[in-house]
């Protein structure tokens, strides 16, 4: 455990601290004049092209446009067009390492909105001679109508079908969803029971399509460094830090391995939560899997914990997460006697 802890800390200093980033033109951006948003879309494209492929660029990057509702569609599509065109021109003018771009679509209420975005992205790829799949999309579901239709169907499933394979994840909008249910501001938190229900519904919908992940919503209580060095300020900072950590650990335990961070102060907490989540369960998970393999994939138990094929699949999910989060390296798992690929192919 100590060796693994030391190595993962060492890797943290050599890997990108920020892995996923969205340039926001929706709620976080607010209402601006058309001229102002036009200029920001163009300048954002130039900036992205300049840093893409460098050590400054996150692994995954994209923009969040406004909703494709009747009221917002014109502005959303104009911003998208200016951004994509500006990015294309900048990529031609200077070498860019940008290999793909993620378009985040908020407040999705029907499958037609998704189909419209897909049609537009198809056209952009052809127009700018980009390979198919250069654009992928994320869908933010934040209204009750996205979870249950009047006819008893699950609209989210039709969203995924309409994405034509471009959708990579479903994201949860905490505040729009809870507001739609009549929940007051005091109850609008990421751990509200209504949010738990919604995220489970999202997991079920995501399981119907391949390679779709579910991202948790925002934690609005920010652990801002206090401006004044007073005991009260320090206590508020510590309380906010603990709250963020507890909510992130809760999300990880429930299978939501991604969430929205609004402020840089939240990033260290997320890294700590991911690391603790893996390391505190690692020894037990390794022991359970090795015992299961030693018994030729028959049911087994370690320390009173029963394992069969179904629970071992959960262990494999854990190890996949440990590697994808950067806490563990695949070679470290092999050195501990765990070969995830081999076990997965044998059960």
Identify the meaning behind each predicted range.
Residues 1-347:
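Expand to "…catalyze enediolate/carbanion chemistry for C-C bond making/breaking, isomerization
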């Amino acid at each position: 455990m100590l060796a693994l802890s030391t190595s993962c800390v060492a890797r943290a200093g050599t890997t990108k601290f920020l892995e996923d980033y969205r340039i926001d033109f929706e709620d976080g951006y607010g209402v601006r004049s058309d001229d102002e948003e036009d200029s920001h879309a163009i300048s954002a494209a130039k900036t992205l092209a300049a840093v893409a492929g460098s050590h400054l660029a996150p692994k995954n990057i994209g923009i969040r446009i406004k909703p494709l509702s009747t009221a917002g569609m014109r502005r959303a599509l104009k911003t998208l067009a200016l951004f994509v065109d500006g990015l294309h021109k900048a990529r031609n003018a200077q070498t860019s390492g940008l290999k793909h771009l993620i378009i985040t679509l908020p407040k999705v209420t029907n499958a037609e909105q998704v189909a419209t975005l897909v049609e537009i992205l198809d056209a952009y790829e052809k127009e700018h001679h980009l390979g198919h799949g250069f654009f992928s999309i994320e869908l933010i579901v934040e209204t009750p109508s996205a979870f249950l239709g009047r006819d008893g169907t699950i609209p989210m499933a039709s969203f995924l079908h309409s994405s034509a394979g471009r959708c990579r994840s479903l994201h949860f909008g905490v505040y729009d969803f809870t507001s739609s249910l009549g929940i007051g501001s005091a109850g609008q938190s990421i751990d509200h029971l209504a949010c738990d229900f919604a995220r489970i519904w999202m997991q079920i919908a995501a399981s119907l399509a391949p390679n779709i992940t579910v991202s948790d919503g925002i934690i609005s209580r920010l652990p801002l460094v206090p401006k004044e060095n007073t005991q009260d300020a320090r206590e508020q900072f510590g309380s906010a830090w603990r709250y963020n950590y507890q909510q992130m650990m809760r999300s990880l335990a429930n299978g939501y391995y991604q969430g929205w961070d609004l402020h840089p102060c939240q990033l260290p907490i997320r890294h700590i939560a991911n690391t603790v989540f893996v390391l505190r369960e690692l020894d037990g998970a390794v022991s359970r899997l090795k015992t299961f393999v030693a018994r030729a994939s028959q049911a087994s138990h370690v320390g009173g914990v029963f394992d069969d094929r179904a629970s071992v699949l959960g262990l494999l999910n854990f190890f996949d997460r440990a590697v994808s989060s950067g806490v563990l390296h695949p070679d470290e798992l092999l050195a501990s006697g765990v070969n995830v690929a081999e076990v997965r192919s044998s059960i």
